[in-house]
């Protein structure tokens, strides 16, 4: 049986769907869910194959987006962190009528480094895939440590992420590999040029996975979108800067 785990909180007049990143689950939002559910009708989701959404194998980005949409409200602000940013972006491209605004957090339309495009070196992603087969819990923990490196609260932020992972059964190796394959191969830079709805991109200045060099490049490529960089955050700004993070989302709500 493959069901998407979905939790709804709050009674705001605007719906906000939160999509987590690779290897994690919706528990990662517990640091901000109380605050956000006082402003929005908040939807917490475990992506297919992650957390409590069991029974899924590796999915393509398009199939992952379709699976998530099955239980989604008719219209919402879609927020995706990291890999979740690609899923939210895919939903905008295929079902724009279901989206009030798009928010990507520490996400890139193309995570993999390409010619004249900063990103994660393909051999690093391939290395993660190889190591998953050998010792996947350690590999996931390594990936989490990368996400908080360099911040003033790096240790406690990494602990918060690790606690999220360990709170629920680990995803299957093929699901984790499928997620890495999406990060390695997907490129939405051109398709997202045509997005006309409110589009907010949030970044961490210290992010080791999504280099800040992509921000001005995407400002130019997507002039209709807005970007904001958390000066002292890495890959998880909602954990290191929860108050500032929520403030930006509440401000966006006033504009949709």
UniProtKB/Swiss-Prot annotation:
Enzyme Commission no: 3.1.1.85
Homology family: Belongs to the AB hydrolase superfamily. Carboxylesterase BioH family.
Quaternary context: Monomer.
Key word Cytoplasm present: yes
Role, per record: The physiological role of BioH is to remove the methyl group introduced by BioC when the pimeloyl moiety is complete. It allows to synthesize pimeloyl-ACP via the fatty acid synthetic pathway through the hydrolysis of the ester bonds of pimeloyl-ACP esters.
Sequence ranges assigned to domain AB hydrolase-1 in this UniProt record: 15-242
Swiss-Prot/TrEMBL catalytic activity: 6-carboxyhexanoyl-[ACP] methyl ester + H2O = 6-carboxyhexanoyl-[ACP] + methanol + H(+)
Organism per entry: Escherichia coli (strain 55989 / EAEC)
Subcellular location: Cytoplasm
Record-annotated active site: 82, 207, 235
Record-level Gene Ontology MF annotations: pimelyl-[acyl-carrier protein] methyl ester esterase activity
Source species taxonomy: Bacteria, Pseudomonadati, Pseudomonadota, Gammaproteobacteria, Enterobacterales
Protein name listed in UniProt: Pimeloyl-[acyl-carrier protein] methyl ester esterase
Keywords, in A-Z order: Biotin biosynthesis, Cytoplasm, Hydrolase, Serine esterase
Annotated binding of substrate, by residue: 22, 82-83, 143-147, 235
Ranges in coiled-coil conformation: none
Pfam families reported for this sequence: Abhydrolase_1
Entry superkingdom: Bacteria
Record carries keyword Cytoplasm: yes
Pathway(s) where this gene product acts: Cofactor biosynthesis; biotin biosynthesis
CC terms in the record's Gene Ontology section: cytoplasm
GO biological process: biotin biosynthetic process
């Amino acid at each position: 049986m493959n069901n998407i785990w979905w939790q709804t909180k709050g009674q705001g007049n605007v719906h906000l769907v939160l999509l987590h990143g690779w290897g994690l689950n919706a528990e990662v939002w517990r640091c901000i869910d109380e605050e956000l559910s006082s402003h929005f009708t908040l939807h917490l989701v475990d992506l297919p194959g992650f957390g409590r959404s069991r029974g899924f194998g590796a999915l393509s980005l398009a199939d992952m987006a379709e699976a998530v949409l099955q239980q989604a409200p008719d219209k919402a602000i879609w927020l995706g962190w990291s890999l979740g940013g690609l899923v939210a972006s895919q939903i905008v491209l295929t079902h724009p009528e279901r989206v009030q605004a798009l928010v990507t957090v520490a996400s890139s339309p193309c995570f993999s480094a390409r010619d004249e495009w900063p990103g994660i070196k393909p051999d690093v992603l391939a290395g993660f895939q190889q190591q998953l087969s050998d010792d996947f819990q350690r590999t996931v923990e390594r990936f989490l440590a990368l996400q908080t490196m360099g911040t003033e609260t790096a240790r406690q932020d990494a602990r918060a992420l690790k606690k999220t992972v360990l709170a629920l059964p680990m995803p299957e190796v093929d699901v984790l590999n499928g997620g890495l394959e999406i990060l390695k191969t997907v490129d939405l830079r051109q398709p997202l040029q045509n997005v006309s709805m409110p589009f907010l991109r949030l970044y961490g200045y210290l992010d080791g996975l999504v280099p800040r060099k992509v921000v001005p490049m995407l400002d130019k490529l997507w002039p209709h979108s807005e970007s904001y960089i958390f000066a002292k955050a890495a890959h998880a700004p909602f954990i290191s800067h929860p108050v500032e993070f929520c403030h930006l989302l509440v401000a966006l709500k006033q504009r949709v």
